[in-house]
Amino acid sequence: VQLQRGVHKINNSVHKIVKEELELRMDHEETYQEFGEKINLQKTKLQNLLKKIKDENKTIAGFGAPAKSTTLLYHFNINPAIMEYIIDDNKLKQNLFSPGKHIPIVSSEIIYEKRPDYLLILAWNFAESIMKNHQEFKKQGGKFIIPLPRLVVN
């Protein structure tokens, strides 16, 4: 960051990023309104699915506790009444709680002890590797829920 007309030359990467942002229409308010509408549609779909699962007396656990999971938990109104605990393989996150919602974060060993019916993947960008690493959960009848970029039950 520098002052306008500063002494530093603008790197070509800055021009590239500005060009990409303009191509993606990031300088238009409508882009963000459309994004918000898409997220709210996913929110409604996920809330309806979670309500249906809970109405069937099925259990739901979260999987993955990245920082972005906090945003998802808040925006999608997910709390301990819906999701009892969050599983994370990172020992540094275990035995802690999710910010604000205070959902316990536990080891993945609990999957095979408590056997939740569904795992809501909160680290959706790692969904493939999470499902691959926990194939046994699926073999035992469990299902994975991937909330974004589009809702998938696998």
Go through each PLM region and give its residues.
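Flexible, glycine-/basic-rich loop-and-beta segments that form/coincide
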Residues: 1-38
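Short, solvent-exposed loop/turn segments at secondary-structure junctions
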Residues: 6, 66-70, 92, 124-127, ...
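A short, well-structured juxtamembrane/interface segment
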Residues: 38-56
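Glycine-rich adenosine-cofactor-binding loop
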Residues: 53-71
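Substrate-recognition/cap helix-loop segment adjacent to the acidic, metal-dependent catalytic center
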Residues: 71-84
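Phosphate-bearing ligand-interacting subdomains
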Residues: 102-154
